[in-house]
Amino acid sequence: MNLMNPEFAMPDVQSTVDTRQMPIQRVGVRAVRHPLTVRTAEGETQATVGTWNLDVHLPADQKGTHMSRFVALLEERGGPLTADAFRTMLATMLEKLEARAGRIEVSFPYFVNKTAPVSGVRSLLDYEVTLTGDVRDGLTRVFAKVLVPVTSLCPCSKKISQYGAHNQRSHVTIDAELAADVPVEDLIRIAEEEASCELWGLLKRPDEKFVTERAYENPKFVEDLVRDVARRLDADERIVAYVLEAENFESIHNHSAYALIERDKRRGA
């Protein structure tokens, strides 16, 4: 039997008509691990591994989508994944899947080679990054989300104590809708500069002295942290909207302190 002969063509069940007349808002593949490259702030490329979610809108009369085409899209993609490249990838997906709406999300670890503040020793620090692209009603939107670990030191603890103050590791999460390409490191830098102190992968004793004193001289409540980062995001014209979170893993409690600011600059809110 020659399966390539039209006389023996294999049936394509997914392309048949569905009589239930129920559209599906999102259908596709999730948790696909696939390599990618991203561009650093210095213009170089960094190789990493992404966990991808891809989906499209399915009309009411169509039984199924073309599942294999999602993975084929990842296989064909090349070059660093910038905001512009992400928009192109979204358009290509809609064309391949014959869809009018769709969404791509990829999460990956991103590494920054940081220099210790006193000794100058260099070490890598990892950050969690998620890029999301969404096409709906003819509008394409691209989001960059990054989780930045930092140090926070309590102003109240410092004020009431004769010496010392409680401090802890904190997470600043910036989820920004982009009007233009924004390097991941720009968002990281904003969060780190507004914290009591940033983190490093490797520190020598002179560096530990520096970060201890730096945090002590720059105390911040979780409210201070989220407001100071928000002020920086407000001033950045490349960002049109954001959801900003700060969470302090309190060293003197068994719970966290948390704050959130959400703003869409297009609405002036």
UniProtKB/Swiss-Prot annotation:
The keyword Transmembrane does not apply. It catalyses: GTP + H2O = 7,8-dihydroneopterin 3'-triphosphate + formate + H(+). GO terms for molecular function: GTP cyclohydrolase I activity. Keywords: Hydrolase. It comes from the Bacteria. Its EC number is 3.5.4.16. Pathway: Cofactor biosynthesis; 7,8-dihydroneopterin triphosphate biosynthesis; 7,8-dihydroneopterin triphosphate from GTP: step 1/1. GO terms for biological process: tetrahydrofolate biosynthetic process. Converts GTP to 7,8-dihydroneopterin triphosphate. This is GTP cyclohydrolase FolE2. The lineage of its organism: Bacteria, Pseudomonadati, Pseudomonadota, Betaproteobacteria, Burkholderiales.
